[in-house]
Amino acid sequence: MYKKLILTVALGIAAVSAYAGGYVTNSNQNVAYLRNPAQNAVIGVQGAYFNPAGIGFMENGWHIALDVQTALQRRYTTSTYEPLKYGIDNEGRGYKKYTGKSFVPALPHLDLAYKHNNWFGSFHFGVISGGGKAKYDQGLGSFEAPVAMIPALINTLAGATAVTAYDADINLTGEQYNFAGQLNFGYRINKNWSVSAGVRMNYLSNYYVGSLKNIRLQPAGGQMMPAAAVLASAISSLTGGTVPADQIAPMASQLVSDKALDAHQKDIAWTPIISVDYKTGKFNFSARYEFNTKVRLDNTTKENSTGISQFDDGKQIAADIPGNLNLGAQYSVKPNFRVALGFNYYFDKQSKQYNNETGLNDKQNYLKHNSFEILGGMEYDVCKLLTLSIGANSNTFGFGNDARFISDMSYSTSSISGGIGAQFHVNSRINIDLGVYKTFFLHFTKEQKDYGANGELIYRKLAPVVSQLPLSPEIAGKLTPENLAITGQDDFYRTSIVAGVGVSFSF
């Protein structure tokens, strides 16, 4: 079976990022993060994103940093669903492993800061969420399962193996980006305190183009045929032949008709940001709060025959960026040795997300608790030309046992990450940064009593047809959501590594 699915992996979840933080956040906004993710209390030009108030403790003048990062990621979803055994290429197995591959060769970031005495300002540009593409050569379970359900249904109703295999052509291309520019202004109150306020402009743009076509079924002892013909024949036999197959054919065609999608979603949203920095002796403490960002994606849809309301033309879709609180501390053990800690808390449950199941902006209610992140790292100045650094962080997501918030199209799992790198001091005003950041994701299994809600889906499609046919009570009794539901599960796992190089100037 030929299936090719190209899908951007980001809703919150971002093919190009190391995916630290909330489900829509790329935290690797400067290469310094790769070599030491504990950047919350940093005093440097990268503070334009991580610690805007800390800019107040830099030297007077201009400070600029540019970097480019390269990301490699793999996503592995193992779907266990009994009807998958009918897949022409699945060799009778009721499970299948889907692998998504993503490679982003160059992802740039810019940081700019200016300080004059007590006054200062900063600017940051980067892809805050989304970006990149993931290629799934074998499709995804959520796309294949509804097709797999068709032979399973026919065989159940027939009480025998009437259909032995299925095939289909599935294509989907998706892209999700949030290009963001962040501007902050601040004032150093005294030698200890500095404050800053700013705003981030987010330009969000999502594209989805795809289709489900040419569903085919293989009758027992026969060859692959159009699904509508096989289905019409099967339904006719269930009526005892009282309704001819050619009379049922139009209804059967609707049940297995081709589906297509061509949609563009976009919005411009604003994130207010406030931060404070307290510096005393060898210690530096920071706090940054980003307010919840109201996002209402406007749909411009050329075609949507999928039945997924999220892509209806003219509809507004809630996709808020969660507010988050970021705390940091840095301690200079010696003049050439520093340690840092950080804590990030994301208010995921308070940010509205569109829910296809209810048609309301309430998907966030599926979350068990908000996500959070713990970070730590250290830096050592080997000599006046070289600084070495290392760090790690862990993040925890509150998906809960049923994990209804995530799917094989959009997910991340709790993880532990580590970064290592170096900064080369060309002179007192020019530095070169190198960093590598590796994430070790945990497996997460999502159990489903009705896998992909396919039982409910098939029931809704069949109900209008069944009501027009003289079926026996025994057969009609099998066509309920409860009887059509088949249990299944998805096991989610990812790998990710990011490397980058950057240069910074002061003048």
Where does each model-flagged region fall?
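Gram-negative bacterial Sec-dependent N-terminal signal peptides
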Residues: 1-20
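N-terminal, post-signal peptide beta-strand-biased segments of exported outer-membrane/organellar beta-barrel
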Residues: 16-130, 414, 437
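General helical structural elements
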Residues: 7-8, 39, 204
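Intrinsic disorder/low-complexity segments enriched in polar/small residues
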Residues: 4-5, 83, 183
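A general structural signal for short secondary-structure junctions and capping/turn motifs
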Residues: 11, 55-57, 112, 266, ...
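Outer-membrane beta-barrel porins/channels
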Residues: 21-34, 43, 107, 115-507
